[in-house]
């Protein structure tokens, strides 16, 4: 669906994207997370042609974005809906008219516009607000209007640029649930740019972590949080753990075994002493997952590894970085 390879972008002599490569699959919800200035919004704008990139390739549906002429770019943007942090609604127009705007720009008939707008307002749950002006709406309702407008032309991809940053936590959850529902019902690819960790954990199947214009890592969201990867630790400012002498093993607790008493059972069955030196549990969607780092004597190391493997428990031996 979207293939980004070795993209470099400069503002004058300042490089803001550095050899960025990401593959985004059709129908997935893909997250791009990083601090302010990481380059994530710039990358998003390279995808829809709002920003030019000097080197590398951005393919959307097998079309090279920087090679498109004006008509081809216009056609591409029909395939790419976009929502923003501050909604970008026209204050003097009603909810209905705001959603209708892209349809009017592309020459749809009044009958087609009415049918499509009413369908979309039903999808986003604000049919009763169709005659209201934006000033009479809450932040969450405004973002629902923006989502409906972004979907007006039946895009294949929805780009979300910090779409929940201006919303309170409860409203954020409701908007994310709406996006998830749209993804499931319409099969639309959604790319979520955010600095909010909870957004990524709630809806993104895969994620890219960015810093200073570079991609630190790309992977399955659950796996990255489960393994507490180096890229994730760097993002959240978590320092590396200094490991004590002996054998140190990280035990991974995916959602299907996170509630089992693995450590105490193992210590009892093997008759060994186990010290827990680090633990981290994360709320991930509706589940709890995480990891523990345990310390055992070197002589018990192989015995513990064999035990964990026999129980189908994922583990990895740790060394000081």
Swiss-Prot record:
Catalytic activity: L-methionine(out) + ATP + H2O = L-methionine(in) + ADP + phosphate + H(+); D-methionine(out) + ATP + H2O = D-methionine(in) + ADP + phosphate + H(+)
Membrane topology: Peripheral membrane protein
Listed Gene3D superfamilies: 3.30.70.260, P-loop containing nucleotide triphosphate hydrolases
Residues that, per the record, bind ATP: 34-41
CDD domains: ABC_MetN_methionine_transporter
GO molecular function: ABC-type D-methionine transporter activity; ATP binding; ATP hydrolysis activity
Subcellular localization(s) per the UniProt record: Cell membrane
Primary subcellular site in the record, as a coarse category: membrane
Keywords: Amino-acid transport, ATP-binding, Cell membrane, Membrane, Nucleotide-binding, Translocase, Transport
A Pfam family it matches: ABC_tran
UniProt cross-references to SUPFAM superfamilies, sorted A to Z: ACT-like, P-loop containing nucleoside triphosphate hydrolases
Enzyme Commission number(s) from the entry: 7.4.2.11
InterPro entries reported in the protein's UniProt record: AAA+_ATPase, ABC_transporter-like_ATP-bd, ABC_transporter-like_CS, ACT-like_dom_sf, MetN_ABC, MetN_ABC_transporter-like, NIL_domain, P-loop_NTPase
Stretches assigned to the ABC transporter domain: 2-237
Highest taxon listed in the record's lineage: Bacteria
Annotated PROSITE patterns: ABC_TRANSPORTER_1, ABC_TRANSPORTER_2, METN
GO cellular component: plasma membrane
Catalytic class of the enzyme: translocase
Described function: Part of the ABC transporter complex MetNIQ involved in methionine import. Responsible for energy coupling to the transport system.
Subunit organization: The complex is composed of two ATP-binding proteins (MetN), two transmembrane proteins (MetI) and a solute-binding protein (MetQ).
Assigned protein family: Belongs to the ABC transporter superfamily. Methionine importer (TC 3.A.1.24) family.
Protein name (database record): Methionine import ATP-binding protein MetN
Organism: Clostridioides difficile (strain 630) (Peptoclostridium difficile)
Upper classification of the organism: Bacteria, Bacillati, Bacillota, Clostridia, Peptostreptococcales
Encoding gene per record: metN
């Amino acid at each position: 669906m979207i293939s980004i390879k070795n993209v470099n972008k400069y503002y004058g002599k300042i490089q803001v994207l550095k050899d960025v490569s990401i593959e985004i699959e059709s129908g997935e919800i893909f997250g791009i997370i990083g601090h302010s200035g990481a380059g994530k919004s710039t990358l998003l704008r390279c995808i829809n042609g709002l920003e030019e990139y000097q080197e590398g390739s951005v393919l959307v549906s097998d079309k090279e974005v920087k090679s498109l002429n004006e008509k081809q770019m216009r056609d591409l943007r029909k395939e790419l809906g976009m929502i923003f942090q501050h909604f970008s609604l026209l204050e003097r127009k009603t909810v209905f008219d705001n959603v209708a705007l892209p349809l009017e720009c592309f020459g749809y008939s009044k009958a087609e516009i009415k049918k499509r707008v009413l369908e979309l307002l039903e999808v986003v749950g604000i049919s009763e607000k169709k005659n209201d002006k934006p000033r009479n709406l809450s932040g969450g309702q405004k973002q629902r209007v923006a989502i409906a407008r972004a979907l007006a032309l039946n895009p294949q991809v929805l780009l979300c640029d910090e779409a929940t940053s201006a919303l309170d936590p409860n409203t954020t959850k409701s908007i994310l649930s709406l996006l998830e529902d749209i993804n499931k019902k319409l099969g639309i690819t959604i790319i979520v740019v955010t600095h909010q960790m909870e957004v990524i954990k709630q809806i993104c199947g895969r994620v890219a972590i960015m810093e200073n214009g570079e991609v630190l890592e790309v992977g399955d969201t659950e796996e990255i949080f489960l393994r507490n990867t180096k890229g994730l630790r760097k993002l959240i400012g978590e320092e590396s753990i200094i490991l004590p002498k002996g054998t140190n093993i990280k035990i991974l607790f995916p959602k299907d075994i996170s509630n089992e008493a693995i450590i105490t059972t193992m210590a009892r069955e093997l008759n060994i002493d186990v010290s827990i030196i680090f633990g981290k549990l994360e709320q991930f969607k509706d589940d709890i997952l995480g990891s523990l780092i345990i310390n055992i004597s070197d002589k018990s190391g192989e015995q513990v590894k064999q035990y964990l493997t026999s129980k189908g428990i994922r583990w990895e031996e740790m060394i000081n970085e």
